[in-house]
Amino acid sequence: MHVLSNPKHVTWLTQMGLDQIGEAYWQLGVPELVEHAIHNSEGVLSAEGALVCSTGKFTGRSPQDKFIVEDEKTRDTIWWGPVNNPFDSKQFDALYEKVTQFLQGKRVYIRDGYASALPEYKLNLRTVTTQSWTNLFVNNLFLRPIDKELTKFSPDFLILQVPEFQADPHVDGTKNANFTIINFTKRVILIGGTGFAGEIKKAVFTVLNYLLPQEHQVLPMHCSANVGTDGNTAIYFGLSGTGKTTLSADPNRKLIGDDEHGWCDKGIFNFEGGCYAKTINLAKESEPQIFDAIKFGTIVENMRFFAGTRTIDYKDSSITENVRCAYPLEYIPGALIPSIGSIPKHIFFLSCDAYGVLPPISQLDKDQAIHYFLSGYTAKIAGTEAGISAPKAVFSACFGAPFLPLHPTRYATMLADKLEKYEVTVWLVNTGWIGGGYGIGKRIDLNYTRAMVTAALSGELAKAGFEKDAIFNLSIPNACPEVPTHILNPSNTWNSVKEYELEAHKLMEAFASNFALYCD
């Protein structure tokens, strides 16, 4: 639809200071957006029909360039610090004006969508982008209104994303030329200087992480979720690379969502309408559902083709390790639509432990669950970042610190209340190393991890009984179907028990130092 044909749209554009734009396209269909992207030289089609695009200079988020406008609404509520940088409200107004002036005479793509599959918590989103592929990304990742809903659509938040606009840090108050700024009072997300579409997704997640606990007492969670044929829901918390998307894409269970959910008294619900999966080393044998979702309508970011073909080389990380694809949830066979589940029966905390000292799976009591939730532990390994030559413990509160506008203890308290109220079993799963740390041991077989998760869900682990780990005081199952018993206790897999204990105590000390941040 050409925007200038609709008086209602013209009125809105005028109110937002966008009335001087040039060509404007509202709610284009997927085929039209793909055509525009190819015509605009934004991307090309792969052999499977997916749209392969480059995000430009930025191939990931820039957390240090994310800001929240500090005003009366946010001054005493935001968890200010390295995660949430304050931005002056007057400087925001000036920068917004500069961005809208920059758009004069330029082509834009506008899309209405919403977050939250549960209607009572719906957040209507209107996104304005300068690139058609980014508009397709928004279509794939957020929930898609039907025609009847569009006629009455009124946005709760405006997202304005202009990669071509470069801020002047000395004048505009940013740290660099790129920025993501959230204004809760004016309900605007302003993004400039970066073409990485994931900034849009995570800015909306940050908004929900602020609004839902304060206005609705809903716990927002950085987790994936699925449900079994018996109706039992499970959720999987984890940082990037821990297996959150992989483990939730189970052919024997229906996928609710792969990344962002809310937990209310009715159950859990997906915030999104799509998935944003990593594709580095993707193989049909190990992740068939994700592999088959890469087809027409899907976006693939920063991937290369095999020479002389349009076949994607999933092993090519020459642009970035953070290669991803964005597709609608419906592209996963058997996905649960609408994506709403019951109160979870099981929670899995996924940690990629590169020290090789955490058990492959262990059961947590309520106090341990809150401890590990606040810790949000995983590990970086040598080679993943400049300057990392040995495993490094990484703690990200609630398994999602970069997206938490409120203090982590606010979310931890909400989780503790739910663990008290409902019968939920919490598990810690090590998807990392066994038999020694990185460089000595080996990464645990994905098939073993799947078998342990399946046994936890079916009750087989509980039937087998548990033994207490001597260092971490974790409850380790005595047996698990399809998994060698000797690997269940990590001390059994090391050549030297003494070396195991030394490394385990190092990790314990790192946990203690990090947890001290929340003890006051």
UniProtKB/Swiss-Prot annotation:
UniProt family annotation: Belongs to the phosphoenolpyruvate carboxykinase (ATP) family.
Enzyme Commission no: 4.1.1.49
Reaction(s) catalysed (UniProt annotation): oxaloacetate + ATP = phosphoenolpyruvate + ADP + CO2
Pathway: Carbohydrate biosynthesis; gluconeogenesis
Keywords: ATP-binding, Cytoplasm, Decarboxylase, Gluconeogenesis, Lyase, Manganese, Metal-binding, Nucleotide-binding
Binding locations of substrate: 61, 196, 202, 324
Chief place where the protein resides: cytoplasm
Compartments (UniProt record): Cytoplasm
Cofactor(s) named in the record: Mn(2+)
InterPro entries reported for this sequence: PEP_carboxykinase_ATP (IPR001272), PEP_carboxykinase_C (IPR013035), PEP_carboxykinase_N (IPR008210), PEPCK_ATP_CS (IPR015994)
Residues annotated to bind ATP: 202, 222, 238-246, 287, 324, 443-444, 449
Protein name, entry field: Phosphoenolpyruvate carboxykinase (ATP)
HAMAP family noted in UniProt: PEPCK_ATP (MF_00453)
